[in-house]
Amino acid sequence: MGRPRRRGRDINGVLLLDKPLGLSSNDVLQKVKRLFSANRAGHTGALDPLATGMLPICLGEATKFSQFLLDSDKRYRVVARLGQRTNTSHAEGALISEREDICHTGTDDAALDSHRGSSQQVPSMYSALKHQGKPLYEYARQGIEVDREARSITVYELLFIRWEGNDLELEIHCSKGTYIRTIIDDLGELLGCGAHVSYLRRLQVATYPSDRMVTLEQLTAIVETAQAEERSPNAELDALLLPMDSAVLNFPEVNLLPTVAAYVKQGQPVHVAGAPGEGMVRITEGEERNFIGIGTIAEDGALHRNAWL
């Protein structure tokens, strides 16, 4: 018989991890889960191994609300290496073409403008999107091209930062599902020289502040120091977590009396005076305004529960 599976802690909250270079999002997720001894953990939108930056990790009950972060806007800083196009649109891909005739007359506002606003984007074959249960990148590595549907994306802001030599640096604020590598590949073709991503960092997810990010090194140091001093690291680790409702603070709040909240918890719709006319809401209970879940205001004005603690 195998050893019994150890149950983790019932710890709930959101950790803003500064994902390091070279590790997959799942790699760092598992490391964080072990360091916190958490029973459940999930990330909220993968970053490539070659990307760094903000990766919100939901622990425990917070995993119920991770979808709302998956659906949120993102902000990135990216450096495009002009003159070289690769099959993956990043630095570790195979070189497809190389051109020396790189235009240095300016930022080419027309090329940048063409990527601002709403558009349709075809995901890269070297992406984690799944086709028949298998990631697209697995097909690509076998030389198989799969038809992909274009998806609606929005680039809210595309800022020119600098252009030095063959490096063009941009900051991009975009909607969910936007592939920065695809934007850079398309931009390189519009500039007539080809391009790939040489550096990518996620600066922000939703409205989370970048100064609350922590690194794996910081987490590991906390655990190792506690072990050396023969004490628990849990209190110090838990202090780094943001509350569960931080994932849904963009939704308007509906505060319920405990007696009314009891009906909603049982799955019964209720009408609440002063609630928004429709849409998703963040539900709190009592004078303490304890977060208890997410609900939807239907067309008839009734509050229905969605994700619940």
Curated annotation (Swiss-Prot):
Residues forming the catalytic site: D48
Sequence intervals crossing the membrane: none
Keyword Lyase: no
Gene Ontology biological process: mRNA pseudouridine synthesis; tRNA pseudouridine synthesis
Keywords (A to Z) from UniProt: Isomerase, tRNA processing
Reported function: Responsible for synthesis of pseudouridine from uracil-55 in the psi GC loop of transfer RNAs.
Catalytic function, reaction form: uridine(55) in tRNA = pseudouridine(55) in tRNA
Pfam families the record matches: TruB-C_2, TruB_C_2, TruB_N
A molecular function GO annotation: tRNA pseudouridine(55) synthase activity
Entry's family note: Belongs to the pseudouridine synthase TruB family. Type 1 subfamily.
EC numbers for this chain: 5.4.99.25
Highest taxon of source: Bacteria
Residues annotated as binding substrate: H43, Y76, Y179, L200
Name this polypeptide is given: tRNA pseudouridine synthase B
Xref: PANTHER family: PSEUDOURIDYLATE SYNTHASE TRUB1, TRNA-PSEUDOURIDINE SYNTHASE
InterPro entries: PsdUridine_synth_cat_dom_sf, PsdUridine_synth_N, PUA-like_sf, PUA_sf, tRNA_psdUridine_synth_TruB, tRNA_sdUridine_synth_fam1_C, TruB_C
Broad EC category: isomerase
